């Protein structure tokens, strides 16, 4: 799950890259060492040539594509986009895909919510700990938090 990026691209930079701004729900695969890292973009983002972006565009469910990529490992040091493009994706009929999305989509949303909650709790801990240690704040003062 990719909730945010470390760096932000400028409009000028976005105009110079071929990938453009990729939509939320894009499945990303690192194609250079380290190869095989996989994530689902939960925010629009831009990538460099070290990634393969699988935009589902409603043709296939993001969760199905994610699970398909996780099920197909690799031992290569690098995979080019040219070598990746002809790979065939075998997928079930729409009824089964819909059932899959109902189950796995709910689980994925829960995972995303838990990651967000964990990030908020980490931020709260990082903000409160120094104040508690220094005595600037006491536990009794934060009971309502």
Language-model features: locations:
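Flexible loop/turn segments at secondary-structure boundaries
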Residues: 1, 35-38
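Solvent-exposed alpha-helices and their adjacent loops that cap or buttress functional pockets
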Residues: 20-22, 46, 80, 105, ...
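Polybasic, glycine- and aromatic-enriched phosphate-binding surface used to engage nucleic acids
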Residues: 11-31, 37, 58-68
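Amphipathic alpha-helical coiled-coil/heptad-repeat segments
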Residues: 59-60, 83, 87-145
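Sequence-specific dsDNA recognition surfaces
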Residues: 1-24, 42, 47
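A short glycine-rich beta-alpha junction/loop motif
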Residues: 31, 45-52, 71-98
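Generic alpha-helical structural context detector
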Residues: 52, 66-70, 130
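Short, contiguous acidic/charged loop-to-helix segments that flank catalytic cores in large enzymes
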Residues: 12-13, 53-54, 111-112
């Amino acid at each position: 799950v990719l909730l945010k990026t470390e760096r932000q691209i400028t409009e000028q930079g976005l105009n110079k890259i071929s990938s453009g701004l990729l939509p939320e729900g894009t499945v990303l695969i690192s194609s250079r060492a380290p190869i095989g890292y996989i994530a689902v973009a939960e925010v629009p983002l831009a990538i460099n040539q070290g990634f393969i972006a699988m935009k589902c565009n409603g043709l296939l469910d993001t969760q199905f594509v994610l699970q398909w990529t996780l099920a197909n490992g690799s031992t290569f040091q690098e995979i080019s986009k040219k070598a990746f493009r002809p790979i065939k994706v075998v997928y079930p009929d729409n009824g089964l895909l819909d059932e899959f999305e109902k189950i796995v989509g709910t689980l994925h949303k829960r995972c995303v919510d838990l990651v967000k909650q964990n990030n908020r709790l980490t931020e709260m801990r990082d903000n409160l700990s120094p104040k508690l240690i220094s005595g600037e704040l006491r536990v009794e003062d934060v009971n309502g938090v």
